[in-house]
């Protein structure tokens, strides 16, 4: 995992792996087939997948197979992982009130230059130019297309003043 200068904390591969392992152990990383605990003859507990008959019974009750309800993340798990702070990922106990800004400089608390923000406007996600703009004079054109899409001829010389 590479860390950028925008990251507030230091992320190492070991710490992220342990975090992912914790999520997997908590059962929120993958959807699981419902399991049932059963006792063997010697008294040991084992986990057993539900039989097809039980799965059919669940399906008849309106429960879809392969569907697991949204699992809430334990608040203690979030408190333990506070060190993973990043502008792209935020682990929080509360739902966000609004979508995050694209860049940190778009936040009004970070950027108090309102005149610059009004002048430049906010950047928009996913908007990229399809071609590079070019600012130079073109002198060898004899025809062009105007803003309404009509073909027009380009004058090579414009005479001004009394003719």
From Swiss-Prot:
GO terms for biological process: cell surface receptor protein tyrosine kinase signaling pathway; modulation of chemical synaptic transmission; negative regulation of neuron apoptotic process; nerve development; nerve growth factor signaling pathway; neuron projection morphogenesis. Keywords: Cleavage on pair of basic residues, Glycoprotein, Growth factor, Secreted, Signal. Its main location: secreted. InterPro entries: Cystine-knot_cytokine, Nerve_growth_factor-like, Nerve_growth_factor-rel, Neurotrophin-3, NTF3_N. One of its GO terms (cellular component) is dendrite. Residues 1-3 form the signal peptide. Residues 123-132 have a biased composition (Basic and acidic residues). Residues 112-132 are annotated as: Disordered. It holds the Pfam family NGF. Glycans are attached at residue 112. The keyword Transport does not apply. SMART domains: NGF (SM00140). Residues 4-119 form a propeptide. Gene3D superfamilies: Cystine-knot cytokines. The keyword Secreted applies. Seems to promote the survival of visceral and proprioceptive sensory neurons. This is Neurotrophin-3.
